[in-house]
Regions:
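Extracytoplasmic/periplasmic substrate-recognition and gating elements
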Residues: 87, 93-96, 194, 263, ...
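Extracytoplasmic "Venus flytrap"
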Residues: 64-80, 102-105, 180
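Short, well-ordered beta-strand elements
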Residues: 60-72, 95-100, 123-124, 173, ...
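C-terminal capping/gating helix-and-loop segments adjacent to ligand/active sites or protein-protein/ligand interfaces
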Residues: 396-416
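Extracytoplasmic "Venus flytrap"/periplasmic binding protein-like
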Residues: 90-158, 189, 193-195, 202, ...
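Periplasmic solute-binding protein
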Residues: 130-145, 149, 160-199, 225-248, ...
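Glycine-centered hinge/linker elements that transmit conformational signals in sensory
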Residues: 210-213, 249-278
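Short, polar/charged alpha-helical segment
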Residues: 54, 72-96
């Protein structure tokens, strides 16, 4: 783990030097683990459910705290889901959920660690996907195998590319919630001024040509972005590589593929075509966008609604597209799963599972996607009449879902 952390520090430094871009999450792999049901696990789930039913019959209410991250539409979605649950299933089963804002993913993770030591954790929390393994291996998360199997939750209904980070050593520790991929955002009004349209930027050569044209013809930046491993990994994946090797004990940035990726961005930065920021300055990218001083930036599909609001306010046309193709298309996934903490009572665990099921069911997956811009996590959600109608009205929202077909293994864990 120490060696891996050192590698990740090196990668972050390289990412900052290259101006390689950013995102809102991290890894994905193309494998789905199977869950083995044990008698002990089933008995555990039965006992917890019986406890919850007895408490409901006696009029007791189980109070749960649920921690979430981010403000804006994401915050509204979390608050609305908790309220809707409390008014329906919660009222029926004697469960009340209080949703509490905890800042960024990193801030939430730090608070969870401190709360676990003090035995004051919430019952549930969102968790950035690349962090799940670390928390699970340290015994902080509840193994969900028994809950999933006893409840008959169809894990196969979740999009396959979103599942790997839910598993640790073939056991389930989280359910896909607000999930994302990095995508390309464009101010198409600026691109048009330079003779380009976002729909024509399909390859790295196109990206370089469009960004150069913007800089030369308008004096604005072709691309603005802050550095982060997530998008750097997407660029490496598109070159048939990754930022770490398969065993995560060596960086691949010093390979021909790594040098090509870093060299591409370094040249554009040196020419003043790309406005690069370090990984702590992501707000400055938003400032460039709001000042109409950049044509292209890369970010999470979860930022779609915020970017649409900016475009509407400032009167420019927003475009979204796949990460431009190098040797091939490719992307990691990001965002968060919902997890259950391991140090709560059986009564609280039974109640927490009810909320986890509710917030990741098809109807709520549809609502969350439309509300926030994150991916619809379930196939039944993405294929629903409601989502299909939404995609017809808002085709920009379908880009990330279509890009899921190109998800590749991202060999790294959260450096935090």
């Amino acid at each position: 783990m120490k060696k891996r952390a050192q590698l990740l520090s090196t990668l972050m430094a390289a990412s900052m030097m290259a101006g390689a871009l950013s995102g809102c999450g991290s890894t994905a792999a193309d494998n789905t683990a199977n869950t083995e049901v044990t008698a002990e696990a089933v008995a555990k789930a039965d006992t917890a459910a019986d406890t919850a039913n007895t408490d409901t019959a006696s009029g007791d209410v189980t109070e749960l705290k649920y921690w979430y991250c981010w403000t804006g539409a994401t915050q509204e979605n979390n608050m609305e889901l908790a309220e809707a649950f409390n008014e329906t299933i919660g009222k029926e089963k004697g469960i009340h959920v209080t949703a509490e804002y905890q800042g960024t993913y990193d801030e939430c993770h730090q608070k969870l660690q401190a709360a676990f030591v003090a035995n004051e954790t919430p019952a549930l929390s969102v968790m950035e996907i690349s962090t799940i393994r670390r928390f699970a291996e340290n015994g902080m998360l509840e193994n969900l195998d028994s809950y999933v199997n006893e409840s008959g939750v169809d894990m196969g209904d979740f999009y396959e590319g979103l599942l790997p980070n839910c598993y640790v050593d073939d056991s389930i520790y989280g359910l896909p919630y607000l999930r994302s991929t990095p995508i390309m955002y464009c101010n198409n009004t600026i691109l048009n001024e330079a003779g380009w349209d976002y729909k024509d930027i399909k390859t790295w050569d196109d990206l370089k040509a469009a960004a150069t044209a913007v800089h030369e013809k308008t004096g604005k930046y072709g691309v603005s972005q802050y550095s982060y491993l997530w998008t750097l990994d997407a660029f490496m994946i598109e070159h048939g590589s990754s930022i770490l090797n398969e065993t995560e004990d060596a960086t691949l940035l010093n390979t021909a593929e790594g040098k090509e990726v870093i060299g591409f961005w370094r040249d554009l930065i040196d020419q003043g075509i790309v406005h690069a920021y370090n990984h702590t300055e992501q707000d400055k990218v938003t400032t460039d966008v709001q000042n109409l001083n950049t044509a292209i930036w890369f970010g999470s599909t979860g930022s779609l609604k915020d970017n649409l609001a900016i475009a509407d306010e400032l009167g420019f046309e927003l475009g979204t597209a796949y990460i431009p193709k190098a040797l091939e298309y490719g992307t990691p996934t990001g965002g968060c799963c919902v997890v259950m903490m391991s140090n709560i009572s059986d009564k609280e665990k039974a109640a927490a599972w009810e909320f986890m099921k509710y917030m990741t069911e098809t109807e709520q997956a549809i609502k969350s996607s439309i509300k926030t811009g994150y991916l619809p996590s379930r196939k039944s959600a993405g294929e629903s009449d409601t989502m299909q109608k939404y995609f017809e009205e808002m085709p920009l929202a379908k880009v990330a879902l279509d890009q899921l077909q190109f998800v590749k293994r991202a060999a790294y864990s959260n450096p935090n």
